[in-house]
Amino acid sequence: LGEFESSECIWEDVIETLPRGELRDFLSELNESTVKVALKPQYVDHIPKAFKGNVGKLLSSVNERGLYDEMIKKFGLGHLLERNLDQLSGGELQRVAICATLLKKADVYFFDEPSSYLDIYERMRIVRIIQELSESARVIVIEHDLAVLDVIADLTHIVYGKKGAFGIFTPARTTRKAINAYIEGYLVEQNLSLIHI
């Protein structure tokens, strides 16, 4: 917050600048370590390096919500339970990763590119499952597939910047407006062309 001499961010100062609302409440909870986040990572191919064993062992180890059997059925994973993670295709790993995330008990579920590696039928199944979750929990999805984004999200932030340098989140807008702004390559409220970034 402009205090360049200080090497650490003081959360209370950041929170104080925000208007009362959901973001302020969330950051307060995060600051107080009362928020638990479940993350589906972007790079599912790293999962077999981090966890040795089979699909059933992984999923049962994260079954905090007691939904193991229901999720196995929803994701069509029954035939994969005895298979080692390093033997799975990209799409199978993606489904296992999303299932594992949903089995965790969390306040916020974060899905980084949940549609990659999946065919259109699997993408739509994942969309329905994530939408169902969003009725009872906070859900954040990072997605580059505009068709999936159009179906899965109510509100969308466009994020732009330079890798390793800076990133800016636009204010939330309806998904349709966000997609149109992205396709047009121009953000009216920032008077910014996305083409040159």
Over which residues does each language-model region extend?
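ABC-family P-loop ATPase nucleotide-binding domains
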Residues: 8-93, 104
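Catalytic Walker B motif of ABC-type/P-loop ATPase nucleotide-binding domains
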Residues: 109-113, 118
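Hydrophobic anchor residue at the start of the ABC signature
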Residues: 97-98, 126
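Conserved catalytic loops of ABC-family nucleotide-binding domains
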Residues: 129-141
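Hydrophobic/aromatic position at a conserved helix-loop-beta junction
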Residues: 102-104, 134
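Conserved H-loop
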Residues: 132, 145-151
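Conserved small/polar residues in nucleotide/adenosyl-binding loops
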Residues: 196-197
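Conserved beta-strand-loop-alpha-helix hinge in the C-terminal portion
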Residues: 158-193
